[in-house]
Amino acid sequence: MRYFILLVLACGGVAACGNPLGLHAYSPNQTDTVSLYALSGTPISLPSGFSIAARHTVRTELASAFDFAFDIDTAGRALLLPTGTLKLGKHSGLQISAQPFDSIKIAPTSNYNLDSALVVNDSSVVIAYSNLSVCGASLGVPYPYYAKLHVLTIDTTSTPNGRRIDFEILTDLNCGYRGLEPGVPRR
């Protein structure tokens, strides 16, 4: 009985610290500049999706392992599409932020758009979370990864390098962490 009480107290202490599984951040948050091409009206060989976990663009005709894709609708609006919009399951989410890119320090836990297109413009700031991933140190508990992106340019023309969005994206690939600042996250 004494050991049970000690175990309960230890678990409570770990949970009170804000990281219930005691996972340590190991990977520095990284910012990359990315170009995606519209799902429609561009060669199929160009990447239209982005995987947060891989920190890489994805050719959507080769794989569905991406967290969001880019397209341009018939009205000429630039769209970011979470997986639910593409009937791939509601596994990732996006939300527009009113804060400047550099001011966002931590990802919110709610109010993500899971199943409809997000209209973006030049300078839009978006917060995203990924499909759930099981990390080695998480004891089998799946976690999403978080990211923030800042739209740099959108080209809606049909020129050879058009129908494209360019953005900078900062990704946090640490299980259980939502920190969106450069370096190893603390929260």
Cite the ranges covered by each PLM segment.
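C-terminal motif of bacterial Sec signal peptides marking the signal peptidase cleavage site
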Residues: 12-16
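Surface-exposed, beta-sheet-biased, low-hydrophobicity segments with strongly acidic/polar composition
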Residues: 17-187
